Swiss-Prot record:
HAMAP family the UniProt entry points to: Ribosomal_bL12
Transmembrane segments: none
Provenance organism: Marinobacter nauticus (strain ATCC 700491 / DSM 11845 / VT8) (Marinobacter aquaeolei)
Keywords associated with the record: Ribonucleoprotein, Ribosomal protein
Sequence ranges of Basic and acidic residues compositional bias: 101-116
Name of the protein: Large ribosomal subunit protein bL12
SUPFAM superfamilies: ClpS-like, Ribosomal protein L7/12, oligomerisation (N-terminal) domain
Stretches the record annotates as Disordered: 93-124
Amino acid sequence: MALSKDDILNAIAEMSVMEVVELVEAMEEKFNVSAAAAVAAAPAAAAAGEAAEEKTEFDVVLTGAGEKKVNVIKAVRELTGLGLKEAKEMVDGAPSTVKEGASKDEAEEAKKKLEEAGASVELK
């Protein structure tokens, strides 16, 4: 029985961030393609449209863990719901996106929580 696009999208929606990253890497390897080109082109197109209106969605990007790495890992786990291993990998792999498409208030709150834990954070 073949899976429909909706079935696949629902399965992906239930995955953790790390599982989605692993899926993308496996797809790149299997089909001998790179998702990097598509990702690089998308922000350029989006930036042109955003110039006319105020930005409503933000990405919270962890740029560094700072001195208190354990506290940063705890904050990442709290914000994302990731397991200890996945949160540690995200912190160790900085810069990494902690939240995507967050509202301005949600992004500011996440940034504050991460900075209080000792991380350096950017909103994009």
